[in-house]
């Protein structure tokens, strides 16, 4: 993977990985591009188990979102809508080099960025969408029966959000460890046949906590406040391209019922346009079940 950069319309430098160097893309890029969007406090490094396989048949692009990884940040900008505007800039940057069909894969907050993109810019830039382990609203809500059966399990109202912010700012190391434990299915809901050694568990924990530690924790806490309140349900109903929803059966972040709401919302007016795939893993299913993830992503992207 090649490291590339571009500048947003407000001067923020965004880093991204590309399976092809942009200066050599013209005439050699595959017709299909998969754009991998990481989750909260993550980076493009999250997809270390996916790059090689996906790049065999697809042009793979994976940004570090603003305030994450090797990307810079502004004093403000801690809003999902700003991240969606950054994505719009990345899409334009990619298309300067090649006219290509793009299917974005949004994991966790990456899915929220895509739903916000749909609300702001529509669907025309993309041939399809993949939403990975994220419900369209984290908070519980009095509207449309959105309670603990569908909302986030740990950050779902003002009190729990403030507690999460405090931990990210004041107990960052513990917050990073708790995130790793909660997002790896074999840690939060272990099974006898998982076969993950203690050594591998330690390596996985270090891998993810080191990525989270690169971020400005106060900036992240402010992004969290915006993210958890954002209700994307109606925006999802406007999607007009094929949708694949992936969810982890052992995810500690959301109940399956909440994550599968995206399928129901798309199909309210367009039956058959969306489908789901449930993995036997946690929130980071792309890391825990990479072979299945890579296969299903490649098949879906090539079908769009």
Predicted regions and their residues:
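Conserved HGGG/HGGXW glycine-rich cap/lid loop of the alpha/beta-hydrolase fold
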Residues: 12-76, 80
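Conserved acidic catalytic loop of the alpha/beta-hydrolase fold
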Residues: 84-101
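Short beta-strand immediately N-terminal to the catalytic nucleophile in serine-hydrolase-like folds
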Residues: 104-106, 132
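Gly/Ala-rich beta-loop-alpha elbow adjacent to hydrolase catalytic centers
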Residues: 106, 110, 114
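Flexible "cap/lid" loop of the alpha/beta hydrolase fold
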Residues: 115, 125-171
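Conserved alpha/beta-hydrolase catalytic His-Asp/Glu region
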Residues: 140-141, 147, 163-238
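Conserved loop-alpha-helix segment in the C-terminal half of the alpha/beta-hydrolase fold
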Residues: 238-281
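Catalytic histidine-centered segment of alpha/beta-hydrolase-like enzymes
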Residues: 278-294
